């Protein structure tokens, strides 16, 4: 599968990996930051779902 035809989440993941690797961010820092981002977006998703009700 070419990236051109990949789902948006896969494209975003690849872009993030490239950015993080190019900036030589330590894996432990990346994982902690991704945990923060994940929690933030889970809260946003919950708020958005509640707003639709």
Swiss-Prot record:
GO BP annotations listed: cellular response to cell envelope stress
Superkingdom of origin: Bacteria
A Pfam family reported for this protein in Swiss-Prot or TrEMBL: DUF2496
Protein's recorded name: Uncharacterized protein YbaM
Organism: Escherichia coli (strain K12)
Gene giving rise to this polypeptide: ybaM
